[in-house]
Amino acid sequence: MELADRAVGLLLSSISLSIFTYYTFWVIILPFVDSDHFIHKYFLPQDYAILVPVFAGIALLSLISVFIGMVMLKSKKKKA
């Protein structure tokens, strides 16, 4: 089981690092590259650089709120 945990941890770390690298390059470096350069076809338009994290944050906060609400409802049922 320890080997599987390490593999999952390595996979999650690799995914996180690749997303961070992609987003950093997209937001910080790409605006300084000419718009007709071939590298632009690998990235979404700059508008999405703000929209994607905002919607991801809203979705995360919504899921956390639903989870907390369900836990609170279950704890009320146990007390009653």
Swiss-Prot record:
Reported consequences of knocking out the gene: No visible phenotype under normal growth conditions.
Stretches that traverse the bilayer: 10-30, 50-70
UniProt feature coiled coil, ranges: none
Pfam short name (any one): DPM2
Biological process per Gene Ontology, one example term: protein glycosylation
GO cellular component terms attached to this protein's record: dolichol-phosphate-mannose synthase complex; endoplasmic reticulum; endoplasmic reticulum membrane
Covalent S-S links between cysteines: none
Keyword Membrane: yes
Topology versus the membrane: Multi-pass membrane protein
Family matches, as InterPro entries: DPM2
UniProt subcellular location: Endoplasmic reticulum membrane
Record keywords, A-Z: Endoplasmic reticulum, Membrane, Transmembrane, Transmembrane helix
Origin: domain of life: Eukaryota
One MF term in the entry's GO annotations: enzyme regulator activity
Pathway per the UniProt entry: Protein modification; protein glycosylation
Subunit-structure text: Component of the dolichol-phosphate mannose (DPM) synthase complex composed of DPMS1, DPMS2 and DPMS3; in the complex interacts directly with DPMS3. Associates with the GPI-GlcNAc transferase (GPI-GnT) complex.
Family to which the UniProt record says this protein belongs: Belongs to the DPM2 family.
Functional note: Regulates the biosynthesis of dolichol phosphate-mannose. Regulatory subunit of the dolichol-phosphate mannose (DPM) synthase complex; essential for the ER localization and stable expression of DPMS1.
Protein name stated in the entry: Dolichol-phosphate mannose synthase subunit 2
Gene name tied to this protein: DPMS2
